[in-house]
Amino acid sequence: DDTDMERSTEEHQKNILDNLRWLGLDWDEGVDVGGEHGDYKQSSRFERYREVAHQLVEKNFAYEDDGAIRFKVPKDETINFKDFVRGDMTFDSSDVEDFVILRSDNSPTYHLASTVDDVDYGITIIARGEDILSSTPKHILIMEALGADLPNFCHLPLLFGPDGKKLSKRHGDTSVEAFRDKGILNDAMFNYLCLLGWSPGDDVEHFDREFAISKFDFNKVLPNSAIFDEKKLLWLNGQY
């Protein structure tokens, strides 16, 4: 996701990938390992997004509006999908306004770029924060207009600080690098992050990646916001 040309830099991208690898995560396709879908950068796919936007206009699913293109939301319809964490979800299309998919400068919005990527890449599970939940009906409408099969959805709870407010700069530097510099081990950080909103059961708290992979189930993730407790992280780090 590098459509914001001012904020998206090679250094920023490298930092994200380095942090993921430090946590012990890897992937089969991506910007640094390649794959069958090009370089996996949205900035390289602008022509594809424009092509899809104009296809939607031709099929009367979208229309031009002052240089931009808006998706035409059908009225009085229900949009249903099953969420692994939140169960059956239903939205009334009348509560969703026509939304921009291509800006007047020909750049795609998040709704268009992410949805087209999910369709083109054959994504089967979309796991993201619950703050994106309200966007999901829009993405489903685009997918249906494109005649694509719907993936499974999973909207994960956000992380909150001990004060009950969403984790942010007010809670200090909570970046992966900051904890790494404090001496937090990657195994401990991975272990602790797994416990935020999920548990393998039987009061087990200390486990490795292989154990987490064997036990993890999206359906067992709690919908309630998880509290990031640095004291608990430090305790767990001591176990390693």
Where are these regions (language model features)?
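N-terminal Rossmann-like or analogous alpha/beta NTP/dinucleotide-binding catalytic cores
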Residues: 1-68, 93-94, 135-148, 188
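A generic structural motif
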Residues: 2-4, 120, 240
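Catalytic adenosine-cofactor/nucleotide-binding cores of aminoacyl-tRNA synthetases and other
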Residues: 6, 147-152, 156-240
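Catalytic cores of large soluble enzymes that bind and process phosphate-bearing ligands
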Residues: 8, 41-48, 73, 131, ...
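Short linear loop/turn motifs
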Residues: 32-38, 68-72, 157, 204-211
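Active-site cores that bind ATP or allylic diphosphates and position pyrophosphate for catalysis
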Residues: 42, 55-169, 175, 200
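Internal, well-ordered alpha-helical segments in soluble enzyme and binding-protein domains
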Residues: 49-52, 67, 108, 135, ...
